[in-house]
Amino acid sequence: MTTLSDIRTRIRQDLGDADSLRWDDDALDRHIARALSELSLAIPRELTATLETTPGSRELSLTTLDGLVEIEAAEYPVDQFPPSYVRFATWEGTLTLHPAIAPDGGDARIYYTAVHTLDETESTLPPHLEDVLATGAAAYAALELASSSTEQLNLNGDTSATYAGWARARLTAFHQLLHTHARKNHVRPRNLYVPA
């Protein structure tokens, strides 16, 4: 499993900074977090959660869904065939179910998307997105260096322009990869259903 350290190493290789002379870990972690945030919005994790309803109440708290991006569907009651999807609304961390009859305390299954996580022990990124993340983070790191080196004396007068050009090319590639892999660009089968 790839960890934050592994991604940092990939970025250092891309940036030619294997000895950590230009970027410390904290700086790279900030750029990784920024790229991971963008990646998570374009290509979030797809998850389900089972939440217990309160008898007579149509509202469910979404605070237990860590990293929630969007609710895709709500099923109530659960474990029926065909599934009993219901209309719903979300507002300020609350999901309101709209079944014909108020819930009786049974479970509701929520289908949702969430942000990816990456730390020193684990990652939720699928392997095919690790290089996408490294591309974005390296672009942001190079952009920072280009910006900070504009007013500095350098042995090579084109240092800032070189990093800026490289960063722009990598950032363009990153955004194209996000667009290519984004959920909104994939055909997803959907069925119309009569609300329960």
Named regions from a protein language model:
Residues 61-81:
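Solvent-exposed beta-hairpin/edge-strand motifs
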Residues 1-10, 27-41, 81-196:
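Internal mixed-charge
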Residues 8-18:
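DNA-recognition alpha helix
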Residues 49-65, 119-127, 155-157:
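Surface-exposed ligand/attachment interfaces on beta-rich extracellular proteins
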Residues 55, 64-67, 90, 103:
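A generic structural signal for short, non-catalytic loop/turn and secondary-structure boundary residues
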Residues 35-37, 41-57:
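Extracellular ectodomain segments of secreted/surface proteins
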